Structures are given as C-alpha cells and as structure tokens.
Amino acid sequence: APRPVLVVEDEPTLATAIAQRITAEGWTARVASDGASAVQAATTLRPDLVIMDIMLPVMDGLEATKRIVAERPVPVLILTARDDEADKVIGLGAGADDYMTKPFSMRELIARCKALLRRVDRAKVIAKNSENEKLLDFGSLVIDPAQRIVTVNGKQVHLTPTEFDLLATLARKPKSVLTREKLLEEVWDWVDASGTRTVDSHVKALRHKLGSKTIRTVHGVGYAFEPPEVQD
C-alpha cells in the first residue's frame, strides 16, 4: 500500500512542489496549511511520516508536532529557515525526528523522507527483536526494551521512539563509546553519515529528560552511556 505522508506547509507553491515529489515516489500526499488542521488531518490520515514547516498560522509547527506525536508516534521532519533551530526542534522535546533548513533540494528532502521511513521499519524490527529482552536495570534508571518504557526513580519518562532506541542502544554497552556513524547505522539504518547533527540533537533531548550526566560526549568520537552512580 502507498505510504501516507502529511505535508504541513502554508506556502502554496512549496506545498504543491513537495506533494508532487511525494506522489512521484509512489506515496500518498495530503496537504494541510496550518498547525490546527494538521493535527486534525493526522488523526484521520494516520500518516507514516509528517513533513512540518515550523512557521505556521493558527498553531506553530512545534506545538502541532507535540500534539500529533502525543496522540500517535510518527516520525516528523521539520522544515526551518534557520539552522540554529535544530536543538529547539529536536533537542527540547517537541518530538521531531529530523529537520532541514530552507532552501533545500527536493532530492535531499526525499532522501531524508526515505531514511525516516526506513527508521519506522527499523523501529518495528528493533521492537520485535526486543520482545524477550531482559530489563536494563541501573538502579534509579530502568530501561524495559520489551515494553519500551523508561523509568527514573520509579517515575515513567516519556521518550519518542527514536530517543528510546538511541538510549537503549547506548545502554546495552554501558561506558563504551559508540561513534555517531555506528549510532546512525544501528538506530536510523543510515549508511551515509551526513546527519551527525541529528544524533547530537537527540542526545541533547535525552540529557534534557534524563539528566546531563546520563550520556557522555567523547569529543571527536561519539557518545557513551554513563549508568547513574549507585547511592549508598
């Protein structure tokens, strides 16, 4: 079946251009021109992917993304005019999976869309493979790969599917450094590692939710999971 893609863009020329490219890929495109109607459209369409402009009338792209993702996990690719918005988009819990800065080439947009759809399929494989996996128990922080639940001091922490898979991938090898390339390959199923900023922004999101010491940066190499210190 063709994969439904929701395009949220208030600039008609761009919206049409994106929708045409998506249709040319054999996917189904549906266009919404403001944040509020995007939230409604997501409920009826149940898209496999959302392409969302950050600057929208009625409700901005970040708020719309939060609401869409809260209702049903779906990868969101944010379109932004400023490159420095990456952390705001991904790193502060709006729930987006990736972002692109305007102007961008349609070819690059479609490549990112394909990567995110692979990420959806990858997540299903990861979930299937984790069905019988034991708890990753680090005392105050517990990760349940089978149920896909993370708790800190007994309280559940809401993570996006990508954040969860990134955390679990790091936590399976505590204190070991994993390169960005390795993480992109394991979590995103990307082989060309052009999206290192994406990994960085997701790490920021995890630190934001779980505390800054949870993931250590090894400069020029990658990241390592640091189990919480055991308190006596």
Task: Give the ranges of each region predicted by the language model.
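Residues at or immediately flanking beta-strands
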Residues: P4, T28, P75, L135, ...
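Positively charged, aromatic-enriched patches within helix-turn-helix-type DNA-binding elements
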Residues: A96, I149-T214, H219-V221, P227
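C-terminal end segment of the histidine kinase catalytic
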Residues: K124, V230-D232
